Amino acid sequence: MATIHPTALVAPGARLADDVEIGPYSVIGEHVEIGAGTTVGAHAVLTGHTTIGERNKIFHFVSLGEAPQDKKYAGEPTRLEIGDYNVIREFCTFNIGTVQDRGVTRIGHHNWIMAYVHIAHDCVVGDRTIFANNASLAGHAEVGDWAILGGFTGVHQFCKVGAHVMTGISSVVFKDIPPFVMASGQPAAPHGLNNEGLKRRGFSAEALSALKRAYKILYREGNTLAEAQAKLAPEAAKHAEVQQLLDFLARAERGIIR
């Protein structure tokens, strides 16, 4: 049976695994489902059609599953889905999706999300990301696996942040950031490959060399995006990492940072 503090309010329809812990004064809504081993701190509010996986640590004053900050929202039963083994620190706010897009805001597994982070409606966050304090995603944004967003990074709506990206503090992201790239500034601009992060994650010397060549084609040779894509195609045929970059560029509807 779940451990629920006497001051917490848990709606009758909420579904809690047997070893879930709910802290003082927290509120758990009617359509919330919480998986095994998840702990919820004090004064947290989990509402809406929200599904939370296993072994998550949700700290004090977090708000999950509230209505999107979108004037078009009219009470539709859209969703928030959170995976397993995430750490969600104090005062984070994650909103449900909207019917104008995918209808769900989705966060993956093993993410480390620091205090005051905002993840807006219809965002998609992959696995093993790090969001430093006060990073914010506007609606419909996407963040790939292993990305690291520096403190106070702001991501414009519909922007995509690729896998293994790292942004500097207070970066303002108006366009898509390709995978493996470091970015910083207002607006964010490319500052080389995330070499140290890629080494720590076990990328081979061959893969790193291929990505360095790809970065040079994309950013150092004065190519247009179309020209860079054409030049990257032969490298992509030989290296999966370059193919991942090329696939991202094909989806970059807002253009990429330059």
Swiss-Prot record:
SUPFAM superfamilies: Trimeric LpxA-like enzymes (SSF51161)
Catalytic activity: a (3R)-hydroxyacyl-[ACP] + UDP-N-acetyl-alpha-D-glucosamine = a UDP-3-O-[(3R)-3-hydroxyacyl]-N-acetyl-alpha-D-glucosamine + holo-[ACP]
Domain of life: Bacteria
Name of the top EC class for this enzyme: transferase
Entry's EC annotation: 2.3.1.129
GO biological process: lipid A biosynthetic process
Nucleotide-binding listed as a keyword: no
Localization in the cell: Cytoplasm
Keyword field: Acyltransferase, Cytoplasm, Lipid A biosynthesis, Lipid biosynthesis, Lipid metabolism, Repeat, Transferase
CDD domains, A to Z: LbH_UDP-GlcNAc_AT
One of the record's GO cellular component terms: cytoplasm
One Pfam family here: Acetyltransf_11
GO MF annotations in UniProt: acyl-[acyl-carrier-protein]-UDP-N-acetylglucosamine O-acyltransferase activity
Keyword Cytoplasm: yes
Pathway this chain belongs to: Glycolipid biosynthesis; lipid IV(A) biosynthesis; lipid IV(A) from (3R)-3-hydroxytetradecanoyl-[acyl-carrier-protein] and UDP-N-acetyl-alpha-D-glucosamine: step 1/6
Chain's role: Involved in the biosynthesis of lipid A, a phosphorylated glycolipid that anchors the lipopolysaccharide to the outer membrane of the cell.
Quaternary assembly: Homotrimer.
Entry's family note: Belongs to the transferase hexapeptide repeat family. LpxA subfamily.
Protein known as: Acyl-[acyl-carrier-protein]--UDP-N-acetylglucosamine O-acyltransferase
Gene: lpxA
